[in-house]
C-alpha cells in the first residue's frame, strides 16, 4: 500500500509484486492509493489502510479500478470540474429565482396584476348578455269574469264546492252576450288594479232565470253601461 506522492520511488517494486495493482480513493481524505492485490483475492472484499489519514477502507475488488493512474487522475479531475460547473449552474438558477420572486412580490407587480384581473372581469361582464325580461300579461276578460263569478257564488253559498262554482261560472259566461261579458270583465279587472278597490263598475245584481235554470248577472242602472240587454 503506497500513497500517490511516493509512487515514483516504489513503482518498480510494485510492478514486481505477484498480483494486480488497483487504484483506490480514500473516502475520508480523497487520497488516491495504489494497492497491490494478489490474483487469488481479486474477487474478494479486502480491508485497506490509508497511508495518509490511517483510515480503514473496505474495498470490493470486483468494483475496484484497474485502469492506468494517469487516466484515473484525469477522470477525477473531470469529475471535480463537473461538480464545480453543476454548483455554479445551481447558484445562477437560485439567484435568478430570487430575482423573479422579488419582482413578483413588488408592489408595482401586484398593482399591475390586479389591474389586469379587473380588465378581464370587465370584459367578461361586457360579453354576458342579460336575458330578456318577461312581461307580465294582463289577465284576460274570461279569467277576470270566472274569478269574480266564483267569488260571488261562494259569498252567496259558502258550502258550494269550488268545482261546482267554477262550472256554474263557466255556464254564466257562455250564456251572457260575448260583447257584454268581455267589456264587463275588462272593466272590472282595471277597477281592481286601482288600489284593489272595487268601483261601481263591478257592482252586479243576480236574478234567477226561471225558463233556462241558470244564473245571470247584469249591471245596475247607475253603472257606466246604462241598462243591460235583458231589461
Curated annotation (Swiss-Prot):
CDD domains: HMG-box_SF (cd00084)
Subcellular location: Nucleus
Zinc-finger ranges (C4-type): 26-53
Lineage: superkingdom: Eukaryota
Keywords from the UniProt entry: Developmental protein, DNA-binding, Metal-binding, Nucleus, Zinc, Zinc-finger
Quaternary structure, from the entry: Interacts with SPL/NZZ.
Protein name: Axial regulator YABBY 4
Lineage of producing organism: Eukaryota, Viridiplantae, Streptophyta, Embryophyta, Tracheophyta
